[in-house]
Amino acid sequence: MAIHITGAPCCWGVDDVKNPYLPPWQKVLYEAGQAGYKAIELGPYGYLPLDIDVVSKELEKNHIGIVAGTIFDDLLAEDNYPNVLKQVDDICGIITKLPKLPTEPGQRYPAPYLTVMDWGHDERDYNAGHSDRAPRLSDEDWARMMGHIKGIAEKAASWGVRAVVHPHAGGYIEFADEIDKLARDIPKDVAGLCLDTGHLWYSGMDPVTWLRKYADRLDYIHFKDINEKVYKEVLSEHIRFFEGCGKGSMCPIGTGMLDYPAIYKVLTEEIHYNGYITVEQERDPRNVATSLRDVKASCDYLHSLGFE
């Protein structure tokens, strides 16, 4: 039994494919391999090519696999739903053709996963981390979004891919009440959860408590750490979530506010989680000069705790 460390392109500032400052995807794969990661996420739709031959060659060269694909889009708008379903087909069409990662005993679903995140709403983006002032969806809008998530999960399942819903700061699934409501409305045989320690903390929740609470839904996990000084400054300003990340709200694992020894303990001794965790550290892509240093530091720290 083991918990394997993997990475994500957001550690190189890759969150918005329209950002003109993104590093070449080949550089990201190379540095992820150099840092010691055995796998990485595809990143936002359109960042890595959807050409299986091109991607396979680069992955093999860097001795790295793919742990998950990502839907990071507006899950609410009806007119965007066909676009999202096309993304599901395109992403699953490539990740299912790549070499599979090992499956650990006790791991409920094999990798690769499809992480599903709601995004793209200014009224929530500017209120990330502020449960008291962030607007909530009407019952009708919430039901529509849940229907879209079920459709996404069912399409992914038709490819043999497990969809996992990722509550994300600045989206319409962020806070405690929304995560609980999601868990009630989406059966666990339809989709699992990908809880993110950093997003939980950012949005007012204790990661240990929530990892324990939803152990039976937890198929995949993201790890982050948060710089306390920057975090407090960012929450006092009226800025978007990723603007705060650009200021340095996220930091290497083990250097911030989160208690990773306690997180390791709850995962290994209490809920007996097995499988994969992905390290993330969102940043401005113009600050990629320190990405390799930071992701290696996170990887080394997690190794010291017992993660593999």
Regions found by a protein language model. Give the residues of each.
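Conserved, mostly hydrophobic/aromatic
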Residues: G7, A32, I40, L59, ...
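Active-site acidic/histidine proton-transfer and metal-coordination neighborhood
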Residues: G65, N80-L193
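Catalytic domains of carbohydrate-active enzymes, especially glycoside hydrolases
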Residues: P24-G46
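Active-site mouth loops of central-metabolism enzymes
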Residues: C10-P24, L76-V84, A134-W142
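Active-site beta-loop-alpha junctions enriched in small/polar residues
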Residues: C10-W12, G43-Y45, I71-L76, W119-H121, ...
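Short, acidic/polar
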Residues: V17-A32, V84-I95, S203-L211, Y260
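Acidic (Asp/Glu)-rich catalytic clusters
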Residues: A2, L29-Q34, P49-A68, D90-A111, ...
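Acidic/histidine-rich catalytic cores of soluble enzymes
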Residues: A39-I40, W142-P252, M257, F307
